Amino acid sequence: MTTVYTLVSWLAILGYWLLIAGVTLRILMKRRAVPSAMAWLLIIYILPLVGIIAYLAVGELHLGKRRAERARAMWPSTAKWLNDLKACKHIFAEENSSVAAPLFKLCERRQGIAGVKGNQLQLMTESDDVMQALIRDIQLARHNIEMVFYIWQPGGMADQVAESLMAAARRGIHCRLMLDSAGSVAFFRSPWPELMRNAGIEVVEALKVNLMRVFLRRMDLRQHRKMIMIDNYIAYTGSMNMVDPRYFKQDAGVGQWIDLMARMEGPIATAMGIIYSCDWEIETGKRILPPPPDVNIMPFEQASGHTIHTIASGPGFPEDLIHQALLTAAYSAHEYLIMTTPYFVPSDDLLHAICTAAQRGVDVSIILPRKNDSMLVGWASRAFFTELLAAGVKIYQFEGGLLHTKSVLVDGELSLVGTVNLDMRSLWLNFEITLAIDDKGFGADLAAVQDDYISRSRLLDARLWLKRPLWQRVAERLFYFFSPLL
């Protein structure tokens, strides 16, 4: 009996080390950033079983077999749609400003279409204004309404939006609503899904959380886009979820969430519509390609129209494009670069681009919330401050709530607004969307918003920062090491 126990023990030990060796080899063979690989290896060697289970669950990008097959199947029809859209030459910009040209050329080469012109944009900073405008647009809708959000939290004005959407469906408007399963868990546990479906709205729970399939699909891959399209002509996107900030996370101790949304009219709605149709097909298997822009209602003749490029990320979309866009924007800056983000855990390349911009004389500012709803990200962000301050970057800590706006402004002319946080999850994993806008007028509007944020912020003093306690430095370095995984 002792011999059997000994044999079993040796086999268990051998299997244990073979498993560690196999996972180690898999990590090394994957094309990933060195810091990310090193962080995973450290976890696996310190906490082997926990590390291996965690890596198999969230260490690699698994969309899931069924969704991956749908993503592959949709691209021939999507590519044909994009090729047909090119026939509408009047909607595409032929020239861009010097600061925006490199980024727009990158997007055109990687996504297959140029930026679209003739759009009218309106920046909106108050959630009440956004929802009231949206309710009016829903009430005036004639054909279709499509929405996708990471979070839909019942309560307050979000319920008024839901009521108006159901009223639209009852009068024959085709309404589709896609919500992330994890982000909108409160919504899916409420009566609202059944009420909406009974009214005729197609409601889809995207990327359902299922612990039984944790090793078949990455559970922390999330649908993080916030988009609304109405009648192939009106569109919204930005950082705001479908929540009333007066009712949302009031016990988090960070204050109300501060967001930014853009309301648009023009062919940009079509460009965003194809992104939505791809998401819808990946999730449901149903194809809903949008119609081409209606030349009879598009404001092409208006010289004040904005030129916009949509940048989409996520499985099935051009790999690393949003990361490349941010790098290109940083390297294109000559006068100033202003960034706002709630979660700042940049890649080494992005950190280097930001610091290099400051070191070559660009006025670089980063606006972050002083209080963060994620302790891990908050500490990890601090680990980058010393290097940023040494390079001459100004760090503003916003004190008026949780600044949730995601924006970049380059030389007052190139603007980036959307859903992308400056962290690994947004840059490499989630379904995200960013708008690149080449327009001085819009840049001035965004600059005014960012100036308002700065007026409600505290500038981080480099000398005081260097005097912070030793325990804070240790905590920052610890979280910094694991930052590639956050």
Swiss-Prot record:
A GO biological process held by the record: cardiolipin biosynthetic process
Compartmental location: Cell inner membrane
Keyword presence, Transferase: yes
Domain PLD phosphodiesterase, residue spans: 219-246, 399-426
Main localization, broad class: membrane
Keywords: Cell inner membrane, Cell membrane, Lipid biosynthesis, Lipid metabolism, Membrane, Phospholipid biosynthesis, Phospholipid metabolism, Repeat, Transferase, Transmembrane, Transmembrane helix
GO molecular function, one term: cardiolipin synthase activity
Family, as annotated: Belongs to the phospholipase D family. Cardiolipin synthase subfamily. ClsA sub-subfamily.
Protein name in UniProt: Cardiolipin synthase A
Organism, as annotated: Shigella flexneri
